Amino acid sequence: MIKSALLVLEDGTQFHGRAIGATGSAVGEVVFNTSMTGYQEILTDPSYSRQIVTLTYPHIGNVGTNDADEESSQVHAQGLVIRDLPLIASNFRNTEDLSSYLKRHNIVAIADIDTRKLTRLLREKGAQNGCIIAGDNPDAALALEKARAFPGLNGMDLAKEVTTAEAYSWTQGSWTLTGGLPEAKKEDELPFHVVAYDFGAKRNILRMLVDRGCRLTIVPAQTSAEDVLKMNPDGIFLSNGPGDPAPCDYAITAIQKFLETDIPVFGICLGHQLLALASGAKTVKMKFGHHGGNHPVKDVEKNVVMITAQNHGFAVDEATLPANLRVTHKSLFDGTLQGIHRTDKPAFSFQGHPEASPGPHDAAPLFDHFIELIEQYRKTAK
């Protein structure tokens, strides 16, 4: 039985469609993502916590879903908005169609709306708070009330909400289409011990570090610097994550203590912003953020262009960079800062997602640079 669904934005704009997920309501910041596929990775990316994701590609759900494509243990997106859900999910890896997957994870979703109109609105007015109501006779007035009651992501610390409850080890590398998920690697195959802060870490980041010889200890977002230093790490990784970086004072304090040592530090996405804040820079909320797998970024030091995956609604304000931070990468879409490197410490970060999943791997060599810094540190400090 087809059920109705309604999306209402805080400005009062209404989109009527049909429900393809759970019955109920979802409230969050409405953003758009331009990736053509990879919807399951997007839904399970913790960076989308408290956000309703609009996918601009018209056909979503063609290849179904499977366990291997999940970037975390649950769906973190607050809701999903698409143009069209195909009648058939066809792929040799498919184990469950998208609609069933959404219902099983209790995710409210709407289809059959004009996503081009919605995307234009978000580009012109900026990301807006919104509410999806799915079920019989959805109440537009109630949806508007809920959308306007949502406080927004400014000032919202979500890293401590999505982080792991306890520390754990990770030694699994990348999987292949033919071989599936690999067995965990043995410790003697992983010469580098890296402590990774989980601010909302994606699994493919962890896999790419393991591929390069890292034995990972994943720690909760609020783990103190003292506890991490007792683990005697060869490197410290700062993961991606949702929300506003500025309220994460616990992480900023820890990073500042790491920067008093010579241990290499590598940050991605939220981790990039936290490294900048710990170094004295400031961050700002973007109009509608960067969300997609086709964003051109210039490596200003090598004078080359990379096509990258992006997912962030905050950015580091380049005008506030202290003297000990140099710019390494910039967005060719809007000129915003994409990468920094400390001039006095082996610490650097990237705003985009070099692990992709979904997206291109042009920025993957950033992981190799982290390993180079670790090898130099081990030679001089140990």
From Swiss-Prot:
L-glutamine binds at S47, G241, G243, L270, Q273, N311, G313, F314. Pathway: Amino-acid biosynthesis; L-arginine biosynthesis; carbamoyl phosphate from bicarbonate: step 1/1; Pyrimidine metabolism; UMP biosynthesis via de novo pathway; (S)-dihydroorotate from bicarbonate: step 1/3. SMART domains: CPSase_sm_chain. One of its GO terms (biological process) is 'de novo' pyrimidine nucleobase biosynthetic process. Residues 1-189 are annotated as: CPSase. The keyword Lipid metabolism does not apply. Keywords: Amino-acid biosynthesis, Arginine biosynthesis, ATP-binding, Glutamine amidotransferase, Ligase, Nucleotide-binding, Pyrimidine biosynthesis. One of its GO terms (cellular component) is cytosol. It catalyses: hydrogencarbonate + L-glutamine + 2 ATP + H2O = carbamoyl phosphate + L-glutamate + 2 ADP + phosphate + 2 H(+). GO terms for molecular function: ATP binding; carbamoyl-phosphate synthase (glutamine-hydrolyzing) activity; glutaminase activity; protein heterodimerization activity. Residues 193-380 form the Glutamine amidotransferase type-1 domain. Its EC number is 6.3.5.5. The active site is at C269, H353, E355. InterPro entries: Anth_synth/Amidotransfase (IPR050472), CarbamoylP_synth_ssu (IPR006274), CarbamoylP_synth_ssu_N (IPR002474), CarbP_synth_ssu_N_sf (IPR036480), Class_I_gatase-like (IPR029062), CPSase_GATase1 (IPR035686), GATASE (IPR017926). The keyword ATP-binding applies. Small subunit of the glutamine-dependent carbamoyl phosphate synthetase (CPSase). CPSase catalyzes the formation of carbamoyl phosphate from the ammonia moiety of glutamine, carbonate, and phosphate donated by ATP, constituting the first step of 2 biosynthetic pathways, one leading to arginine and/or urea and the other to pyrimidine nucleotides. The small subunit (glutamine amidotransferase) binds and cleaves glutamine to supply the large subunit with the substrate ammonia. PANTHER family: CARBAMOYL-PHOSPHATE SYNTHASE SMALL CHAIN, MULTIFUNCTIONAL TRYPTOPHAN BIOSYNTHESIS PROTEIN-RELATED. Belongs to the CarA family. Composed of two chains; the small (or glutamine) chain promotes the hydrolysis of glutamine to ammonia, which is used by the large (or ammonia) chain to synthesize carbamoyl phosphate. Tetramer of heterodimers (alpha,beta)4. This is Carbamoyl phosphate synthase small chain. The gene is carA.
